[in-house]
Amino acid sequence: GTEFYRWGVNGPDDARKKVKKLADAGVDIIKFIDHDLMTMEEAKAAVDEAHRNGLPVVAHSHRPEEIRRGLILGVDNFEHTGLSSAPKYPDDIMDMLAERTAQMNKGPLFWTPTVEGLYNYEYLRDNPEELDDDSWHLGLPDSIITDIKQSFQHPDQLPYFQLTPIRKPTLERKFNQLREAGVVMLIGTDSGIPMKFHSQSTWKEFDVWVNEFGVDPMLAIRAAPYWPSKMMKVDNEYGTVS
């Protein structure tokens, strides 16, 4: 069933063909997940084809090898802080990040940490009345709304968040490691994970950055419209107020 929202690839030619098909269909971006399970030839073919078609490539960063390979392949942006409950990024990855961000000719390396979903889980678990807000119902049929509501009747039992109590304490350290490495951080959300909806997640990401991690508010504001428009190569149309 996953073929409806993610495509596996079987060889470099298949990778190129699928990226080209997506490009011809008008997508704005190519997203990698589990690319540490692809061959380097497959992954390189996909990245090269995306860039050939003017599309940025975003890569998951849940596992160390996803980051290493993404840096070697030249992806444009990483998503999530990743590495589960590990306390920090490995030294070799930090060295690779510093090497990449030092290359001004390649432009910025972007990173979208998506921290608020994990950071706010325990609060939401203990204050579930927030989920009564119906702003997330927009555009959904009643049957889907009912199904979603049933899915979080017992938020303390959701398997997705089992490791959150030991993952949350690692988020700020990893966030600061990335900032110190010189990546350009982007405001983005992981809307779609349990109890996280597009209608509320963005301001909560701002809140964690500024009020929990101490990011300057103006830097956080630029990380939402301006830098994402640069990463998406649409800054001539979006991203600034003038």
Language-model features: locations:
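Active-site mouth loops of central-metabolism enzymes
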Residues: G1-K17, P56-V57
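Non-membrane alpha-helical structural segments and their capping/turn regions in soluble enzymes
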Residues: V9-R16, M40, K44, D91, ...
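Conserved dinucleotide-binding and phosphotransfer motif residues
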Residues: A25, N53, A181
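Active-site core of metal-dependent hydrolases
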Residues: F32-K168, I193, G214, M232
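His/Asp/Glu-enriched, well-ordered alpha-helical/loop segment
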Residues: D156-L158, K168-S242
